[in-house]
């Protein structure tokens, strides 16, 4: 066995608050070996990120380590150090140097006021005894290693290919300017994937022994996620680093981890080799996490959730009691049922018709005039039948969200037609447009920013009723709100609480209840589960399907996660650069994708299958 570089023993972390104490970590233990990747997986609130912050010595007040040890070996054959007992000044010598961390949201991790070069150089000089010019070269080398910058040879080749008359003596200067131009760029000028590469370059710039990656790909598209995972894996192997990879998605863990620790409510409930965890999970929580992710190979009527595998209750003394359950096998939707459903839609008149729709955003010139338009939606046409779910997939920037908001007239189109129930609504204004809002609703991506934090949940759900004068009395409206909250799986007394008092999944249920308040016919779900843990995501997806059946709803389901879209959709449109590049039934798109772009999206989905786990281990060998 390889040398142990980090060993956590019986670690306990508590957060005292208002006379109550929340135990975020309850005696967790694990070991990390040189060159190994340990995956830590669990839902929000399980203690994953608190574990990382405790190792880094970055726990926020009032969080405190109340017990246990964190033993770190800074050099081979050196004595281990207990990081818990290390004075803050000595801890600073290791943090960012020997132990580095990549955070979940790169945009909030970088200072928008400074260019990326300044921030990289600052981090390097803080941990290494080098001059500013040396730090600059290390920063450039780091950006090349994470493939944000091409190598010197590739830059030279680019210049020689674009200009046959180029003076070779000018190449060194051009290469230098090209590299320095990247250092001069600011965070807002880079995409999410590029920003995460900057964060990775910063983390590895001081040659850490341990790299902690806390949900480093959660905010990224599946294709960008796949390239970042491959990059992290490559860097780890080339540098022989030990790595802790934290995520809520077991599918991702299967792509990168050698060992896995599954966390639930501050405890490690199962741990072992990655292939063992995926081929033969023992704990009901692990089984639930694996089962709740939509499969590309099967089409169940509903997804299994963690609650199908276990129940958890706290005793009067605060002891957590987990009771395993045997889940009922999910009923598969047959090929005949799918064909009959599609045939039924084909016989119906469209509810929504889109004809040659174009949406552009003006690019301003130096003097404020419009130079040109950036076409977010460029000549899109399709129909949506009553009762069906049309999936809309593509990477960030492909135009899917702009298209969804344009259909609701939240963004004005440049040209084309939006026809709803045989009425052209493209130019509707005033009262006719307001009446249309009753029929067409949207559930946004982030449930927290969708709800006013100053409004009680009941008032938020009631607001559409007041705007459209629905319900004769306040009592009638409150009864309607209570009915809606109960229908989405919340108690009626939830109407007296504020958004911050709910979990992410519960907040999204509130948003769904609000979208149903006016009995709409058509709802756009815009990345409405992408901000949720996979287990909560499964619950919300099941709810959306139930509501569609109960209320005869028509959905457009927008997402970058193709496995989720396949579970939800009857037909799928694939968007790229403002255009529909492929469309068909959900089954045909997945079984026989025609376009290379669609094939790339499908190949990038982390499945968590035993075969993918075995392939990962073969690559590692």
Spans of features found by a protein language model:
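ABC transporter nucleotide-binding domains
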Residues: 1-621
């Amino acid at each position: 066995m390889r040398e142990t570089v980090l060993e956590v023993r019986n670690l306990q972390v508590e957060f005292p608050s208002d006379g109550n104490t929340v135990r975020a970590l309850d005696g967790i233990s694990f070991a990390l070996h040189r060159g190994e990747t340990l995956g830590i997986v669990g839902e929000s609130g399980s203690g994953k990120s608190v574990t990382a912050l405790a190792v880094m010595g970055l726990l926020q007040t009032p969080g405190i380590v109340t017990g246990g040890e964190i033993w770190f070996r800074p050099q081979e054959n050196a004595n281990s150090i207990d990081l818990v007992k290390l004075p803050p000044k000595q801890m600073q010598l290791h943090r960012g140097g020997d132990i580095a961390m990549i955070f979940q949201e790169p945009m909030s991790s970088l200072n928008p006021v400074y260019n990326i070069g300044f921030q990289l150089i600052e981090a390097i000089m803080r941990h290494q005894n080098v001059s500013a010019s040396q730090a600059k070269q290390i920063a450039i080398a780091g950006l090349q290693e994470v493939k944000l910058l091409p190598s010197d040879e590739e830059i030279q080749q680019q210049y020689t290919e674009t200009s046959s008359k180029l003076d070779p003596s000018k190449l060194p200067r051009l290469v230098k300017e090209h590299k320095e131009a990247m250092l001069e760029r600011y965070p807002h000028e880079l995409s999410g994937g590029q920003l995460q590469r900057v964060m990775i370059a910063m983390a590895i710039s001081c040659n850490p022994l341990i790299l902690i990656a806390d949900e480093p790909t959660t905010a990224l598209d599946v294709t960008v996620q796949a390239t970042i995972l491959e990059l992290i894996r490559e860097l780890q192997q080339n540098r022989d680093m030990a790595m802790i990879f934290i995520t809520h998605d077991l599918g991702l863990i299967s792509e990168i981890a050698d060992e896995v620790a599954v966390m639930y409510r501050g405890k490690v409930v199962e741990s072992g080799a990655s292939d063992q965890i995926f081929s033969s999970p023992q704990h009901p929580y692990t089984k639930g996490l694996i089962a709740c992710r939509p499969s590309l190979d099967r089409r169940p009527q509903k997804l299994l959730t963690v609650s199908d595998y276990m129940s958890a209750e706290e005793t009067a003394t605060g002891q957590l009691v987990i009771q395993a359950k045997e889940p009922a096998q999910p009923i598969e939707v047959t090929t005949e049922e799918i064909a009959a459903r599609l045939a039924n839609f084909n016989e119906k008149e469209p509810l929504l018709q889109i004809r040659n729709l174009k949406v552009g955003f003006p690019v301003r010139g130096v003097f404020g005039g419009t130079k040109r338009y950036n076409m977010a939606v460029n000549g899109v046409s399709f129909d949506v039948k009553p009762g069906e779910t049309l999936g809309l997939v593509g990477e960030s920037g492909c135009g899917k969200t702009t298209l969804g908001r344009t259909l609701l007239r939240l963004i004005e189109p440049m040209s084309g037609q939006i026809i709803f129930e045989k009425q052209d609504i493209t130019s509707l204004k005033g009262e006719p447009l307001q009446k249309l809002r009753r029929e067409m609703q949207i559930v946004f991506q982030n449930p927290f920013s969708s709800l006013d934090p100053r409004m009680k949940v009941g008032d938020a759900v009631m607001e559409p009723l007041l705007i459209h004068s629905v319900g004769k009395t306040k009592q009638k409206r409150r009864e309607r709100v209570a009915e809606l909250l109960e229908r989405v799986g919340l108690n009626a007394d939830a109407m007296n609480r504020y958004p911050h008092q709910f979990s992410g999944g519960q907040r999204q249920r509130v948003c769904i209840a609000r979208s149903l308040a006016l009995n709409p016919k058509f709802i756009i779900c815009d990345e409405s589960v992408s901000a949720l843990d996979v287990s909560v995501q499964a619950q919300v997806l099941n709810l959306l399907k139930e509501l569609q059946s109960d209320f005869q709803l028509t959905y457009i389901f927008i997402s970058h996660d193709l496995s989720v879209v396949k579970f939800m959709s009857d037909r799928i449109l694939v968007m790229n650069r403002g255009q529909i590049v492929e469309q068909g039934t959900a089954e045909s798109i997945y079984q026989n994708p025609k376009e290379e772009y669609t094939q790339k999206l499908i190949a990038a989905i982390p499945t968590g299958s035993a075969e993918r786990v075995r392939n990962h281990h073969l690559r590692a060998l």
